[in-house]
A protein has these predicted regions:
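Rhodanese-like catalytic fold shared by cysteine-dependent sulfurtransferases
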Residues: 1-21, 27-59, 67-108
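Short, surface-exposed ligand- or partner-binding patches at beta-edge/loop junctions that are enriched
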Residues: 62
């Protein structure tokens, strides 16, 4: 089973409507360079031990390119969590000129 994928535009619209929550599975330096506002940050390597922190409802899983988030979204789907992969990851988010939230007010 493969988790469904949504485009950056589709994820942004669903976030705006409150239909899903974003979970960013990137590493610290990637997160610090900018992330989706309101996203929960749990690096991929910590997810298994922190799965209880995931919000209820549909989740959009985010990484840099969509590869790691695809693996995580598939794993979550197999575990009974309603998860989608952000197709193209933050690269697609940037390409669509969608807003990011910098850490400490600046982008690395």
């Amino acid at each position: 089973m493969s988790a469904p994928e949504l485009s950056a535009i589709e994820v942004a619209a669903a976030l705006e409507r409150g239909e899903l929550a974003a979970v960013d599975v990137r590493e610290p330096a990637e997160w610090d360079a900018g992330h989706i506002a309101g996203a929960l940050w749990i690096p991929m390597g910590e997810l298994a031990e922190r799965v209880s922190e995931l919000p209820q409802g549909r989740l959009a899983i985010v990484c840099r390119s969509g590869a790691r988030s695809g693996v995580v979204a598939d794993w979550l789907e197999r575990s009974g969590v309603d998860a989608v992969n952000l197709a193209g990851g933050m690269q697609a988010w940037h390409a669509a000129s969608l807003p990011i939230e910098p850490v400490d007010g600046w982008i690395a």
